[in-house]
């Protein structure tokens, strides 16, 4: 599906969203999660379908999971605006895999990066809870990426507030995702990723009460010559560095852009 940008229409965006829903239903049989560092870059007319998965080993005191899965669809509706639809599934220990959230929102590119330098964006997402007696949530925060030659540093800082009658906290949750990456060539790269989560900023507690993990990740990028079709893959091992976190998390990402 590699149409010239000038021929892409809102109808095609709707078709892609429908495709994402179909994939989300099928994904109920796989093992996936959302440990992924997002880029601030926005490209008008580009459609991206992403799958972010994880499998957990050695349950933590506050995290007792088997697997989780996130499917994300993005569409560049303007030079700096991006429309986002997401779905999230999770399987806890002793439970079955369940659809947990449906999410919709957007991203605005504040500072556009050209080659080396800084890129900056802001993302906002409304997360609809799909399970009874769980609160809806609003996620918002900045994304930044700095590039110098083959090296780059990316950080996402997201705040999450609960809304609705089933709120469990009145404060905000904080999630910080970061990545240091070195590209060896146009296809291969290695990096280190880290993920931190404080579930209630008004009662942050000790380090071991929070969820923190980091580890090495390998990246592969493929581009179809003569077309706009791009594939990106990543696989890594994240080690829990707090008592609340699972000992080991195997993460994998797959993304197609056109």
Residue spans for each PLM region:
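Short, low-complexity intrinsically disordered segments enriched in A/P/G/S/L with frequent Arg
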Residues: 9-10
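Transmembrane beta-barrel domains of Gram-negative outer membranes and organellar outer membranes
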Residues: 31-258
